[in-house]
Amino acid sequence: MKKIYADLHIHIGRTFTGRAVKITGAKTLTLDRILVEASEHKGIELLGIIDCHSPEVILELEEGISSGKYRELDGGGIRYRSTTLLLGSELEIYDEACSGPIHVLVFMPTLADMKQFSNWLSARLKNIHLSSQRIYETGLNLQKKVQDMGGLFIPAHIFTPHKSLYGKGVKSSLTEVFDPSMIDAVELGLSCDTDMASHVSQLNPYPFLTNSDAHSLGKIGREYNELYVQSADFTEFALALKGQDDRKIIANYGLDPLLGKYYQTACEACGEPAVSGETACANCGKARFTKGVSDRLRELSDQLEVRVPRPRYVHQIPLQFVPGVGPKTLDKLKKAFGTEMAVLHEAAEEDLARVVPPKTAALIVKARSGKLELKAGGGGTYGKIKP
């Protein structure tokens, strides 16, 4: 048994032919570069790529397996060097039961399963090549299909104001759109942590996941999970979600919710926090506010005490957020310590200070221990570390 880090929500920006998959994703976010980044620079051993339904992604994986670059694992997933790729698909549900669009993650055990799932999807999506497409099928039928194929069904960034389960998807309960028995886990999203979500009793049965939702290489690993498993593959991941046979989620590492883009209710135009009772922004006069995750959770919360034991949640500040850590400094740190995970979790302050200025080393250690002062984000603008 061993401990591994897992980030299970990574997009592909472009295929090997240059075709767009996630239109808002970086052009450098290709399959090859993602796997190199995760394996050699980030230290992520289990990586969920959630655009694997796209035909050109499937083709690239097939060719990589044929050439020996990639290797299919008996337990499910595809191995590249020290990283296992989990085959995932992000889909948008907006059926008659929904109050708004909902994004979900689906994972399949093998490439053959994902290819079969992609064929099934092709009759239900307008463009099978693109990411996060609306599926013209009910959420319940999608859940049934995933379960029948031995896959995993995980609602994504469930409190984010746009395109999520509790953002706009349901009025108050997940049972409005889903069969609760066919949900394997829920992904919290960047503006929420375990303490916040644990006050919603309908989530008690489900493990929490913290993932990056990376749209660029640098964002891989900004949120991740620590798992205790026998090996990095689909079967072991599924066991860890269920807490079976000693497999488990040890910890969730995520942004302090204050750093998220939607923590507090704020003006969409300028990011100014909303003032209770005001209908227009005090700063710019616009009347467009995005409800913050913290306010939405106050509406949904129905238990004061946390009743389900949960893995510890570690407020993690990505190195890119730390003042003084630009691209060149980040490269120096990775060359000295190997991966970002090693810098964030293992490097002693005195060792860091041999590579970067002592002030920067001290900030990295403070970021690791959650001792930095933060300014809350909202309205689509990230929070910041206060000077």
From Swiss-Prot:
Segments passing through the bilayer: none
Leader sequence residues: none
Top-level taxon of origin: Bacteria
Entry-linked Pfam families: HHH_5 (PF14520), PHP_C (PF13263)
SUPFAM superfamilies, per the entry: PHP domain-like (SSF89550), RuvA domain 2-like (SSF47781)
Gene3D superfamilies cross-referenced by the UniProt entry: 5' to 3' exonuclease, C-terminal subdomain (1.10.150.20), Metal-dependent hydrolases (3.20.20.140)
Family: To M.jannaschii MJ0043 N-terminal region.
Protein name in the entry: Uncharacterized protein YqxK
